[in-house]
């Protein structure tokens, strides 16, 4: 590379970063691609906003049935820009779901799920399910009336499943009734299990897209 800096030369010698840059910038983009093909990327941006704002809120949120609601109220009223952080978190959550739905429709209508991209579609469906789980678990964390009854209803749904239904309900609730253990489990799922699971499937999804490229027009 002409007129390269010593810092660039140092990294280039060890990591060959120019090859990576060339691969990224020279990837072929089909001429039929339009703005609707950006919906998946917008969904990713929403997730990153969720991750950042959610991480910020963990500094103040207390996952106990006695302090959860008051800690959220404290965040909204006393913490500098706390109201903005939580509001952005909620808005981007809604936007993420909307962009995900539109992205799924775009992929389906343009045949992006067909051979050889079946696994890309499968990972996308898994991520859609995880996103719904994000909404369910996050809705409960303020532990207000809406959150409590939402948890009680959602965690009771598996009871209709034959044989394993009661076991699944108890597994979700951490006992026979909704309480502290339930909130702890939902908090753990929302802040640790689901984000990292989604990140793994996102990586798989993007690597497959990178390998196979964007599907052609109908």
UniProtKB/Swiss-Prot annotation:
Indicate whether Ligase appears among the record's keywords.
no
Task: State the NCBIfam families in the record.
Answer: PRK03735.1
GO cellular component terms, alphabetically, are: plasma membrane-derived thylakoid membrane
Cofactor stoichiometry and binding? Binds 2 heme b groups non-covalently with two histidine residues as axial ligands. Binds one heme group covalently by a single cysteine link with no axial amino acid ligand. This heme was named heme ci.
Please indicate which superkingdom the organism of origin belongs to.
Bacteria
An example Gene Ontology biological process: respiratory electron transport chain
Residues that bind heme b 1: 103, 205
Q: What does this protein do?
A: Component of the cytochrome b6-f complex, which mediates electron transfer between photosystem II (PSII) and photosystem I (PSI), cyclic electron flow around PSI, and state transitions.
Gene that encodes it: petB
Binding residues for heme c, per the UniProt record? 38
Q: Where does the UniProt annotation locate this protein?
A: Cellular thylakoid membrane
Q: Where does heme b 2 bind?
A: 89, 190
- Known cofactor(s): heme b; heme c
Mind telling me what this protein is named?
Cytochrome b6
Q: Does the keyword Heme apply?
A: yes
